Amino acid sequence: MVFPAKRLCVVPYMEGVRWAFSCGTWLPSPAEWLLAVRSIQPEEKERIGQFVFARDAKAALAGRLMIRKLVAEKLNIPWDHIRLQRTSKGKPILAKDTLNPYPNFNFNISHQGDYTVLAAEPELQVGIDIMKTSFPGRGSIPEFFHIMKRKFTNKEWETIRSFNDEWSQLDMFYRHWALKESFIKAIGVGLGFEMQRLEFDVSPLSMDIGQVYKETRLILDGEEEKEWAFEESKIDQHHFVAVALRKPDGSRHQNVSYQDDSKPSQRQFTILNFNDLIASAIPMTPEDPSFWDCFCFTEEILIRNGSKS
C-alpha cells in the first residue's frame, strides 16, 4: 500500500528584528497616503483618522505598516490574512487564532520625535522606547528636572547631573527615560508603575551613533535583575532607543551578557523607507479620497501652530 506523502510545515527561520522609519522626513503624496491606509485594518484606519496632528497620524500609520510587514515577511503570513488586536492596555498583538510557528513571538513599537521604531524577537519578551532630546516647552531645564524629580532615583539624578552642560544632562535624562519605558512596555503594565522602583546603572556614559550597547544594568526594588538585558543605541544625534529583553521563563538571554560581552553588538537598526514599508502590502479596503482631505486638514493645523512633522 502506498501512503500519501505527509505535508511538511516549513517553519521560517527568524532572528531578532530592529527597524526604524523616519516619520519626520516622510511627506506622503496622496497616492502614498491612500495606499497606506488601504493596507491596514479598518478599525486602525478609523483610529488614525482621529489624530489632530499630522505627525501623530504619520507615526501611528507607520507603526501599523511595520507590524504587518514584520508578520508578513518573518512569519510568512499573507498581508491580508494578518489580524491584529489590542490588549486591555492598548498594546498591539497578533490575534490568538493566528497560525504562528513561534509561540513566544513578541514585538513592540514606539514613536516619538522623528521616528517610529520596532523591535521583535522569536523567543524573547521585548519592549522598546525611543526618546528625542529636546528642550522643555516651558521653563528652564532645572525647573523641568524639579517637576520630574520623582521619576528617578537619587543615584540616577547624580548620573544625569554629572555633566557640566545642561544639554548633556537633558540627553542623559531622556536616555534613562527610554530605558524605564522599555522595561514597562516589555512587562505590559502600562500607566501606574512606580518608576522609582527602577534604577539603571548606565554604561558607557557616552554612546556612538549607529552602535548598539548592552552593558547597562537594571536594579529593581534594590535588587539587580540579571534576567533582563538592555540594548541601547542612538539612531542619530538626538534620538535614544532602548530595547528590553527577557526570556519568557525568566532566564537570561544567552547572547546578551554584561560580564562577557561589553562591546557593541551587531543588531543595529535598519532604517526603512516608505517603499520598504509597503513592499509586501496588499490593499484590504477600497480607496477613500476623503481620508487624504482629512490629512491635509491636520497638516494645516500643524502649520498654523508653527510646528513641523
Swiss-Prot record:
It is found in: Cytoplasm, Cytosol. Its EC number is 2.7.8.7. GO terms for cellular component: cytosol. The keyword Glycoprotein does not apply. It catalyses: apo-[ACP] + CoA = holo-[ACP] + adenosine 3',5'-bisphosphate + H(+); apo-[ACP] + acetyl-CoA = acetyl-[ACP] + adenosine 3',5'-bisphosphate + H(+). Binds 1 Mg(2+) ion. SUPFAM superfamilies: 4'-phosphopantetheinyl transferase. Its cofactor is Mg(2+). Pfam families: AASDHPPT_N (PF22624), ACPS (PF01648). Belongs to the P-Pant transferase superfamily. AcpS family. PANTHER family: L-AMINOADIPATE-SEMIALDEHYDE DEHYDROGENASE-PHOSPHOPANTETHEINYL TRANSFERASE (PTHR12215:SF10), PHOSPHOPANTETHEINE TRANSFERASE (PTHR12215). This is L-aminoadipate-semialdehyde dehydrogenase-phosphopantetheinyl transferase. It comes from Rattus norvegicus. The gene is Aasdhppt.
